[in-house]
Amino acid sequence: MANVSKRLRALKEKIDRSRNYPVVDALQLVKDSATAKFDESIDVAVNLGVDARKSDQMVRGAVVLPKGIGKTVRVAVFAQGDNAQKARDAGADIVGFDDLAADIKAGKMDFDVVIATPDAMRVVGQLGQILGPRGLMPNPKVGTVSPDVVGAVKNAKAGQVQYRTDKGGIVHCTIGRASFSVDDLKENLVALLDALQRAKPASSKGIYFKRLSVSSTMGVGVRVDQGSVAA
């Protein structure tokens, strides 16, 4: 343990916090700093040139990362009839309607993503105070309220991540695990940045991508030279 702490301390001293590193170097440094006993997540923070106080400059959506996120995602679906069977066939872990709502009210929430068909929102709407604070409330903007229940389930299972600007105009998102290769992490990062570019508000002026940094769960943050990401 002492050797790990010493190694991490040396790595932190090696990183220049004021420097923008080429993306491959930045990701390698972050991987090297992930010395915890578990497979740490690799996260990105993107400072966007938006005014988060204005509703028309909110950046929110979802993207399927090509290399996944390195974890098994449990999906719960609110649907009935044919859609319920389609959800099961697509790989949903939990499918229900009023019974699923009752389970959630009772505290049974063994899932990571909640999907609902549009007609189910009359039931799901009653769960806002439970699902909302946990970031689980279905929303059409991120594809979790959809008539295409098969596509929604498959996207969630394939490693879809949701993104949303916080009060400071920053998007925080996981792009993989420390066990991922640098190439796979870069591919996921590029997919996220492409999605953010497509979601750029028309009212956003000036520089859109202001700053980009990557970090691991327990490690250090490293700033990335944005010009190197597309290289």
Swiss-Prot record:
NCBIfam families membership: rplA_bact
Entry-linked Pfam families: Ribosomal_L1 (PF00687)
GO biological process, one term: regulation of translation
PANTHER family reported in the protein's UniProt record: 54S RIBOSOMAL PROTEIN L1, MITOCHONDRIAL, LARGE RIBOSOMAL SUBUNIT PROTEIN UL1M
Domain of life, per lineage: Bacteria
Keyword Ribonucleoprotein: yes
Job description of the protein: Binds directly to 23S rRNA. The L1 stalk is quite mobile in the ribosome, and is involved in E site tRNA release. Protein L1 is also a translational repressor protein, it controls the translation of the L11 operon by binding to its mRNA.
GO terms for MF: rRNA binding; structural constituent of ribosome; tRNA binding
Oligomeric form and interacting partners: Part of the 50S ribosomal subunit.
Family as reported in the entry's similarity comment: Belongs to the universal ribosomal protein uL1 family.
Designated name of the protein: Large ribosomal subunit protein uL1
Gene3D superfamilies, per database record: 3.30.190.20, 3.40.50.790
One GO CC term on file: cytosolic large ribosomal subunit
